[in-house]
Regions:
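Nuclease-adjacent, charged terminal/linker segments that flank catalytic cores
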Residues: 1-102
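Electrostatic, structured charged patches in enzyme active sites and in nucleic-acid/phosphate-binding
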Residues: 2-17, 100-303
Length: 303
């Protein structure tokens, strides 16, 4: 009996699919970043052959990054978002359509700083043989927070899902906050209060007054999404080292002085690192300052 031929998509089609999925999830990616994620062991020019048909079909567009640099950041068009909307790897993640190259350029600095951090984790995972893929960094994850005094939602810049395979198999999750020093240090530190409230928040059963038994039986809000509360990582860039170090000190002070955050720190690893250190030494290098306890720097899994 003759078996029917199995039709496999060509390599070019597979790369095009993956590139569109990556742009859909990460919002904005440079050609270099796409090359690092998708085909790091091939000549850089090959990524342009992947992107050209997507651009010709109107699925992606780009914005120039600086007048002299020649760098471009690619983003999804409405047509591209429609194509990728039902893909399994993007399920539950509505693709963000950026209206124009101007709109893309205005959000590029923050978005691409996050991608740089993601690539630091991805590069190290590949070197170590850990399980962490280009889609394991999920940008702009939002959770509703009814009890936060008007700030009714928590939006993390990203959530990462990482599985270390050596010396034993361990799964890690982290909320990631990217700080480019565009907000005050106090406002940055206040994000810890929002995370602490999310950690403590237990929704009341609808239509019930909430007896002690009900409260004990109810899940905390975060347990609806995570088996363990993710560690919280602040990644700073965009200013002299002295400024970034001072902001990390302010984060540590918030963890020490605010009772709600102090309680969070007793249950959840909290740390901060400078992006350039992260890129140079890798996430497992001694680049993370714990936000509670001793300030001795360490790797992110040892916070």
């Amino acid at each position: 009996m003759t078996r029917p031929a199995v039709i496999q998509p060509g390599t070019a089609d597979t790369y095009a699919h993956q590139a569109l999925a990556l742009i859909a999830q990460h919002r904005l990616l440079t050609s270099t970043q796409l090359h690092q994620m998708l085909m790091p062991h091939t000549p850089p020019r090959k990524i342009h052959k992947v992107l050209a048909p997507l651009r010709a079909e109107g699925l992606i567009a780009h914005t120039a990054l600086g007048v002299r640099s020649g760098l471009k950041a690619h983003f999804l068009t409405a047509a591209g978002a429609q194509v990728a909307a039902d893909w399994p790897e993007l399920r539950g993640r509505a693709a963000t359509v950026i209206a124009s190259p101007t709109a893309a350029s205005m959000r590029a600095a923050h978005t691409l700083a996050g991608v740089r951090a993601h690539l630091a984790f991805l590069t190290e995972a590949r070197e170590r043989g850990d399980e962490y893929q280009p889609l394991d960094w999920m940008p702009e994850v939002t959770h509703r927070l009814p009890d936060t005094g008007g700030q009714d939602r928590l939006t993390a810049d990203a959530v990462l899902h990482y599985t270390a395979t050596q010396p034993r198999r361990l799964q890690y999750r982290a909320f990631v906050e990217i700080d480019r020093t565009t907000m005050s240090s106090e406002r940055l530190a206040r994000k810890l209060i929002t995370y602490a409230r999310f950690h403590d928040y237990t929704p009341q059963p609808a239509g019930r007054r909430g007896t002690a038994a009900d409260q004990n039986a109810a899940l905390s809000a975060w347990q609806r999404f995570y088996p363990r509360f993710p560690r919280i990582l602040f990644i700073l860039t965009g200013a002299p080292r002295a400024t970034l170090t001072a902001r990390i000190t302010d984060l540590r002070r918030m963890a020490a002085d605010h009772g709600l955050v102090t309680r969070l720190a007793s249950h959840v690893p909290l740390g901060a690192a400078i992006l350039e250190d992260l890129e140079e030494a890798g996430p497992s290098g001694p680049v993370w300052t714990p936000l509670a306890g001793t300030g001795e720097r360490r790797g992110w899994t040892h916070l």
